[in-house]
Amino acid sequence: MSEPVLWVERLSVAFDHPLGKVQAVDEVSFQLAPGERFGLAGESGSGKSTLALAMLRMIKPPGRIEAGEVRMTGTSLADLDEDRMRALRLAGIALVPQGSMNSLNPVLRIGQQIADAFADHGLRMRHGEAGRRITSLLAQVGLPASVARMYPHELSGGMKQRACIAIATCLQPKVIIADEPTSALDVVVQRQVMQTLARVQQELHAAVILIGHDMGLMAQFVDRLGVMYAGRLVEIAPIADIITRPRHPYTRALIASLPSLETRGAFAGIPGLAPLLRDLPSGCAFHPRCSIAAERCRREKPLLRDVEDSQVACHFA
């Protein structure tokens, strides 16, 4: 097996709050192989986006990385000074942010925003060379050269999202984190955006971490899926296993909540509400909503352990 391009070990993130500490990410561990498509799924507030920001060392006060380590190709990101970490962003690991509407600078043309990314990383190019590079990047994501001269408000939602992909991949990163890249887009545009992301990934031979809660989209795109609940990874498995034989009760509940065109019957919701991250229940955080919870689940927090080709944090897996 090839060496992981990204290695996350027991990463924890907390936020200070007047009513108590908010444990947004709790000892998350996983590895990402070169060229792999890895998904992170879970309800809103489960810690997915916070985990992505922690991997990029972009957590701002009152948040902090409490513990754990992130490595890229053997280098610990915690050991890098701010200048080297800034250089690694875009060039080594890049983020396609959630909500392109709020991610692009409204007063700068798209071409200028790409050129600024080049300049920020020390790439000095003649005007003509920069223009050719920008045109090539836009073509890579299926946008015409004229987009370089346009402002964000002149683009549709799908075009904005593809412009964000162009900016994120302008320095050919080895890892692309796509945080809900299809949110607020209709299904036709969603497909176009995901096809664009897949094409760019293949051309760059990059690995992708896709964050979202659309299990159908995950099933079509990722190779392996990590399911998060209350800041913890509760299951990691090949996507086919997640869909056909989920092992964690929360994963099973997520799959059961999906409407099906085949059965056309009633689908089951997940009872109760996700817990407050500053007031987590003892033991397994899912036990108040779990149909098979026992006394042990209320007392002991299950650890992520190997079960065949999967990893599951459940006492009964």
For the regions a language model picked out, list residue spans one by one.
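A short, flexible loop at the N-terminus of ABC-type nucleotide-binding domains that lies
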Residues: 2-5, 14-27, 58-64, 81-85, ...
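A short, proline-enriched helix->beta-strand linker immediately N-terminal to the Walker B motif
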Residues: 170-174
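P-loop NTP-binding/switch modules centered on Walker-like glycine-rich loops
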Residues: 43, 57, 177, 181, ...
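Conserved ABC ATPase "signature" region
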Residues: 76, 128-146, 255
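Short catalytic/signature loops enriched in Gly
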Residues: 4, 236-317
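Conserved ABC transporter NBD signature motif
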Residues: 64-76
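Conserved ABC ATPase signature
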Residues: 151-155, 159
